[in-house]
Amino acid sequence: IHNLLQGEQQNMHSLIDDLAAVRALIQLYIDGSNGDTAKLEQAFHGDARMFGRIGDNPTGSGPIADFISYIGENPGNAGPNYLAYVRTIDLSGDAGVAVLVETDYLGHDFVDYFSVARIDGVWKITNKTYAEVGLTQPPS
């Protein structure tokens, strides 16, 4: 029984470490999305893709390299009331998802769904799918 409990404890420590690593990965995205393309390149796998739309415009569909180029050419997309909150992280082995809620980015509010994978021992974002959930309301 002692060996079994010790194994479960090691698995829990590993899961906690993985959750912290994915949270840090999403923080790289948050920090990079306002113009720091080096952080975005660090966060995303080179073959990552993105899909989403703002209103009826499928503005963000394609290779992540296109998004990173756009951010480099158009820094400062986070508005004055920008907030980002990691709502959930769910991991199983070397795969998982993270959900990020953002307000006041490009004047809109978003929920981002990131597929993540541990590749060669390093967590990377492999896909971003987002939903625009409304226009940012100015503070009253």
Please place each PLM-identified region on the residue numbering.
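Short beta-strand edge/turn micro-motifs at domain boundaries
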Residues: 1, 109-137
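Short, low-complexity N-terminal intrinsically disordered segments enriched in polar/charged residues
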Residues: 1-46, 136, 140
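Surface-exposed, charged secondary-structure patches
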Residues: 17-21, 49-108
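Short beta-strand segments enriched in hydrophobic/aromatic residues
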Residues: 33, 44-45, 102-104, 129-132
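Short secondary-structure boundary/capping segments
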Residues: 40, 87-89, 115
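Short, charge- and proline-biased low-complexity linear segments
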Residues: 55-58, 62, 130-140
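Low-complexity, flexible helical/coil segments
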Residues: 77-78, 83-88, 124-125, 132-140
